[in-house]
Amino acid sequence: MPHAPYDERLDALLRVAAQVFARKGYHATTMRDLSRASGMSLAGMYHYVPGKEDLLYLIQRRCFQSVLHDVQEAIANVTDPIERLRTFVRRHLEFFAANMNEMKVLSHEADSLTGEHAREILDLKRRYAQLLQRTIAGANGRHPSVAAYALFGMMNWIYTWYRPDGVLGPTELADTIAELFVHGVRGGTA
């Protein structure tokens, strides 16, 4: 049975697994690869998780739960609808700028989970997408569902080109993307 979510060794294992999955891909990665990268024996790894899919599931669950909680908390007391949308974008991008390997794994391995793992992650993703759709609708955005997925498209591929130590810090990146999106979603012109 996996340890509590805040177990330091499990947390370290999940970080290493995200790095290896991001570099090699989930399907090309073996438990031996993860053992070597983590410095943990295979027996030690199996003490934490029954198998590789469980690691992928825990990475995805932890990310979606964390970002969902963080965004909900951040927008809870923001009354201005446009500022709520900006806050959503800011928190989403700041979270994933700090977790680029996890972002890549979430983007590339979305269909690699099976059974109950897949259902639970799909439910978390649905809840997160609905939160963004409601946020966009509150800002008088047109077609909230389409707009939400377009915004996720803008935000979720930053791992392919964004460097946190580059010209824009995570907050500046988030503010830039939020402005681009807000002007488009409200029908503004550039």
Regions found by a protein language model. Give the residues of each.
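Generic hydrophobic, amphipathic alpha-helix propensity
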Residues: 8-17, 34, 59-63, 67, ...
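Amphipathic alpha-helical packing segments from all-alpha helical-bundle domains
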Residues: 62-68, 72, 115-140, 145-149, ...
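Amphipathic alpha-helical segments used for helix-helix packing
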Residues: 97-116, 160
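N-terminal intrinsically disordered/low-complexity leader segments
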Residues: 1-8, 15, 19, 189-190
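Hydrophobic alpha-helical connector segments
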Residues: 58, 72-98, 151
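Short coil/turn segments at alpha/beta junctions that flank glycine-rich nucleotide-binding fingerprints
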Residues: 23-27, 78, 99
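C-terminal peripheral helix-coil segments that are non-catalytic and often amphipathic
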Residues: 94, 98, 130-138, 154, ...
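Helix-turn-helix
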Residues: 12, 16, 20-54, 58
